[in-house]
Every structure is written in structure tokens, then in C-alpha cells.
């Protein structure tokens, strides 16, 4: 018998399994759930012995691991719970140093929702000329605010600080630059955290489903208000690149040049899957409470984890190999299940920094809008039909236009992991691989055949892979566009992945400036 076996047998027998008492899950009503009740309930679960007791050192062959990462999350929940007894823990996401456009005219949304009124937060740089034809509309990514560059009212550097200003990419000596917070956001524009004027309560998940096109229509209401008939250019990166293309398709006569950086003409399965995973993690946080958390503890743990997942898609493996490698934060200590490798501490920091800087419901709604994005003609025609039907209901006096019901749709047979004939490489090949863009997408992008379009992709981008930008360019060419420009930055130029559009002033900024001039 092995000596180790003898030692192992000398230890006490393990504890008998503890039978957990079932507890009832209360579905939150429209009213916000009581914060103190939910917090006290979680404490009671820990104190009533419903969980297995940690074995004492003399009963165990090894000491129990410590979990400072979980301790920190529990401490944050306790702090937010204490704050909620006062004015509420939900942070103010914006400092208010922006301009605000308010529309009293209802906005019909693509999936039948209706906003009786809405606000769009925006900031501007440069001077609007007399003809009002020097306007560049800058579109943001998913979680960005209108603060793309510092202003006199808000000197804090913006998310595109180095790209905007005199002599820079968006030259404010020439152009009047407008950047908005998108509809559905939480930085001053109407979104789930906004009060519904119909009943004086925050929308929460009563907010209607959005599309990228809905966001663009709201932006053009702002342009109408400012008296801007036609944009000199529509510029955007990531989700903003999707908006930039959508602006040209929806309003071809009102858009001049188009710039789409690290975007796509339709969302693809990998990107949808990654955003779905983020939403699932967030929605599984008990504090999310089906969206009605505004008078309680915000789902900071779910937001933190969702951001960590997102950060994995924003940068690239090669960059992290060079930056972090396999280094541990403290090699002198024994490995832990909490963040230990440098890459783990980086992700932990990214999640912690973001978890209270953005509204959870806004993340859910806007990321879903990205998933729904498809500029193919079939989807455009279906949307047109939906809007006509919704408008007919409104005209007939129907109060509720959209159907908020939902069912969990699962396949009748389990998914097969082995490839089938319908998923062959030939059938799933992209436009860049086959040299032929899908006819449906070619027809959908036909309104852009006479526009000057710049498409930029990054080889190290895993969220919006470079083949998706090649698909845009090749689709436009087949649609009859003879002036489209396509640039792909290789790994020898940038290893920053999807975030390259935020960091590479020389290559991204230089290409955009040359195109605009």
C-alpha cells in the first residue's frame, strides 16, 4: 500500500451531504423590489446553515482557499445596500455637460415600440458654416457617450480626444463635428433608465426593443432641429460603423461621405454569441431583478463579468502574449482561484472599472440592437412592413403597438456537434473568400452605390473580423460603387484588435483624414 494511501485513510471521513432547503424565487413586479429585503434574504441564507459549513483545519487534509475577489463583491453589495437607504445606489452616469435635444413628436420604432417623446444628448466641436454643409456626424460604439473630445464645459479628455481638433483627423478648422449619445443609452439620451412620461416611473425593461436604424432616425431628428439638410460625412467605428452605413441607406440624399471603421453590414454568429453571453451573465445576477433595480442594488457583479467577456473580444491574443505572457501577479505566492495571472488581473480591473459606469439595461438593449443589425434587402423590406402595420395600429387608436411577449425557443432535436451537409465550408464561406457578395446584401446596399465610402478593417480584430469589412467593400463594388476605398491594417501594423480605432491615430486617423479631405 502506498504511504500516501495510509495517510489519506487516517483523515476523518468527509461530512455527510447537507440537504439544501428549497426556497421560493419571487418574480419582481413592475414596482422596484425592496432592496433591504433582498439583501437581508441573502444574508439569512448564509446564516441559517443552508450551505455546507467550511471544514475546520483539523478536519481537512488541506486548508480552505481564501477568496478576496468574492469578499470584494460582497463588500460592494453591502455598501450599495447602505446607500440605497438614502437616495438610491444607482449612479449618475453623466455629468450633464452636454447639450440636449428634446422631441415632443413620438418616435415609432422598428419592432413596433413607441416613444411618446425622447431626448438626445450631444456635443459639438468647430463652427457650423453659413450653408450648414460642413457637418460630420460622429457615431459611437456601444458604451460610449457623446463626449468624444474635451469641451470648455467638460475638460475631461474624450474617447476620441486625439482624433478631433484643429489639423487633426476631424479637423475642427474645417468641419462642425456632432457626436450623440445613442437612443437607448444612459449618458443623457432617452433609454431604460429614463422616466416614462406616461406614468412617471423609469422605463426599465418596459423600454421597447431598439434597432440601429432607430438610433439613426433619432439622430436625424436632431439634424432637422439644427437645420442640417445634408451631412458632409457620416463617420463611425464599431457599432458606430454600423450606424454610419445605416445612415446612408436610410437617408441617401442627406449623407455625403461615409466612413465605417471595424464595423459590418450585418451581424454575424460569433459576434452575436459573444454579446448573448454577456447578456446572459448580466441577467443571471439576482440584483438585475428583470430590469427593475433602479431603487435597489444595481447588478454590479453581472456587469463586471459581462465587461470582462467583452474585453476579451476587444483586444487580441498576440498583444496579450507580448504584454502579459504567462506572468503571474505575485509568483512568490501559491496560485489562487481569484485573479492570479497578470491577464486575469487586467480583466478584473477592466470589469471593476466599468461595472458602475454604465447602465445594465442600456447594455442589454443596445447590444441586442447590434445583434439585430442586417442591411440586407429582405430585412429592410420586412422592417418596412412591420412599421407600416404598427403605423396602421396607431392610426386606428390602438394604445399598445408592440408585442412584448417572448418564448424560450429550443430545437426539437439536440444540436449535433458533427458538421452536416448544410454547414459545409463552401456554403458558409464569406464574400471575401468566394469573391461574390450575397445578392440580398448587394441589393440592400444599393442606395450607397454613388457615395464615397471608406471601409477600414483590422486583421487582429476578433469581434468584427477583417473579412466583415472586406464583405462591405466587395458588396458595395458589386452594387455598382466605383469609388469605395478599403484599407486593412495587418498584424505588422496593429495588434490592438478591435480597440485599434481608439488607439491608432497614425493609421486609422491618417486614413480617415485623407479620405475626408
UniProtKB/Swiss-Prot annotation:
Compartments where located: Mitochondrion
EC number of the protein: 2.3.1.-
Residue segments, region Important for substrate specificity: 141-144
Residues that hold substrate according to the record: 307, 499
Active site residues per record: 238, 461, 498
UniProt pathway annotation: Amino-acid biosynthesis; L-cysteine biosynthesis; L-cysteine from L-serine: step 1/2
GO MF annotation: an example: L-serine O-succinyltransferase activity
Ranges annotated as biased composition (Low complexity): 416-436
GO cellular component: mitochondrion
Compositional bias ranges of the Polar residues kind: 36-64
Catalytic activity: succinyl-CoA + L-serine = O-succinyl-L-serine + CoA
Site (Important for acyl-CoA specificity): 275
Region (Disordered): 36-66, 413-436
Transit peptide limits: 1-46
Source superkingdom: Eukaryota
InterPro entries hit by this protein: AB_hydrolase_1, AB_hydrolase_fold, HAT_MetX-like
Family matches, as SUPFAM superfamilies: alpha/beta-Hydrolases
AB hydrolase-1 domain sequence ranges: 134-386
Main location: mitochondrion
Record keywords: Acyltransferase, Amino-acid biosynthesis, Cysteine biosynthesis, Mitochondrion, Transferase, Transit peptide
GO biological process: cysteine biosynthetic process from serine; cysteine metabolic process
Family: Belongs to the AB hydrolase superfamily. MetX family.
Function field: Transfers a succinyl group from succinyl-CoA to L-serine, forming succinyl-L-serine. Also has weak serine acetyl transferase activity and homoserine succinyl transferase activity.
HAMAP family: MetX_acyltransf (MF_00296)
Name the UniProt record assigns to this protein: Serine O-succinyltransferase
Source organism per UniProt: Emericella nidulans (strain FGSC A4 / ATCC 38163 / CBS 112.46 / NRRL 194 / M139) (Aspergillus nidulans)
Amino acid at each position: 500500500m502506498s504511504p500516501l494511501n495510509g495517510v489519506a485513510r487516517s483523515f476523518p471521513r468527509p461530512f455527510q451531504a447537507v440537504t439544501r432547503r428549497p426556497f421560493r424565487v419571487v418574480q419582481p413586479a413592475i414596482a422596484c423590489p425592496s432592496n433591504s429585503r433582498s439583501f437581508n434574504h441573502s444574508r439569512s441564507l448564509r446564516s441559517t446553515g443552508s450551505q455546507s459549513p467550511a471544514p475546520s483545519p483539523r478536519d481537512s487534509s488541506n486548508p480552505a482557499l481564501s477568496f478576496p475577489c468574492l469578499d470584494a463583491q460582497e463588500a460592494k453589495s453591502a455598501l450599495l445596500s447602505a446607500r440605497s437607504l438614502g437616495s438610491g445606489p444607482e449612479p449618475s452616469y453623466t455629468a450633464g455637460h452636454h447639450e440636449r435635444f428634446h422631441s415632443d413628436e413620438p418616435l415609432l420604432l422598428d419592432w413596433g415600440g413607441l416613444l411618446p417623446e425622447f431626448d438626445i444628448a450631444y456635443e459639438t466641436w468647430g463652427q457650423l458654416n453659413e450653408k450648414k454643409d460642413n457637418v460630420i456626424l460622429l457615431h459611437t460604439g456601444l458604451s460610449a457617450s457623446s463626449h468624444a473630445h474635451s469641451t470648455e464645459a467638460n475638460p475631461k479628455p474624450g474617447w476620441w480626444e486625439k482624433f478631433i481638433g484643429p489639423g487633426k483627423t476631424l479637423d475642427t478648422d474645417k468641419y462642425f463635428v456632432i457626436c450623440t449619445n445613442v437612443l437607448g443609452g444612459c449618458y443623457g439620451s432617452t433609454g431604460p433608465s429614463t422616466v416614462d412620461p406616461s406614468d412617471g416611473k423609469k422605463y426599465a425593461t418596459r423600454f421597447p426593443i431598439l434597432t440601429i436604424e432607430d438610433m439613426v432616425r433619432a439622430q436625424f431628428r436632431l439634424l432637422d432641429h439644427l437645420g442640417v439638410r445634408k451631412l458632409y460625412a457620416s463617420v463611425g467605428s464599431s457599432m458606430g460603423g454600423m450606424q454610419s452605413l445605416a445612415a446612408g441607406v436610410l437617408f441617401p440624399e442627406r449623407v455625403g461621405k461615409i466612413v465605417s471603421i471595424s464595423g459590418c453590414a450585418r451581424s454575424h454568429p460569433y459576434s452575436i454569441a459573444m454579446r448573448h453571453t454577456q447578456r446572459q451573465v448580466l441577467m443571471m445576477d439576482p440584483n438585475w431583478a428583470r430590469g427593475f433595480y433602479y431603487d435597489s442594488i444595481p447588478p454590479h457583479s453581472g456587469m463586471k463579468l459581462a465587461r470582462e467577456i467583452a474585453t476579451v473580444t476587444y483586444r487580441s491574443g498576440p498583444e496579450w502574449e507580448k504584454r502579459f505572457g504567462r506572468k503571474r501577479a505575485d509568483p512568490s505566492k501559491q496560485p489562487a482561484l481569484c485573479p492570479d495571472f497578470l491577464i486575469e488581473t487586467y480583466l478584473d480591473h477592466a470589469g471593476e472599472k466599468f461595472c458602475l459606469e454604465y447602465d445594465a439595461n442600456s447594455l442589454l438593449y443596445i447590444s441586442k440592437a447590434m445583434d439585430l443589425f442586417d442591411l440586407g434587402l429582405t430585412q429592410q423590406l420586412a422592417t418596412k412592413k412591420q412599421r407600416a402595420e404598427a403605423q396602421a395600429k396607431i392610426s386606428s387608436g390602438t394604445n399598445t403597438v408592440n408585442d412584448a411577449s417572448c418564448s424560450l425557443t429550443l430545437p426539437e432535436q439536440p444540436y449535433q456537434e458533427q458538421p452536416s451537409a448544410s454547414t459545409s465550408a463552401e456554403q458558409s464561406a464569406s464574400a471575401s473568400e468566394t469573391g461574390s457578395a450575397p445578392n440580398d446584401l448587394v441589393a440592400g446596399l444599393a442606395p450607397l452605390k454613388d457615395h464615397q465610402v471608406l471601409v477600414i478593417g483590422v486583421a487582429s480584430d476578433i469581434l468584427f473580423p477583417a473579412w466583415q469589412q472586406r464583405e462591405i467593400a466587395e458588396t458595395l463594388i458589386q452594387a455598382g460603387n466605383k469609388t469605395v476605398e478599403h484599407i486593412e491594417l495587418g498584424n505588422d501594423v496593429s495588434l490592438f484588435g478591435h480597440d485599434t480605432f481608439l488607439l491608432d491615430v497614425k493609421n486609422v486617423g491618417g486614413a480617415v483624414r485623407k479620405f475626408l479631405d
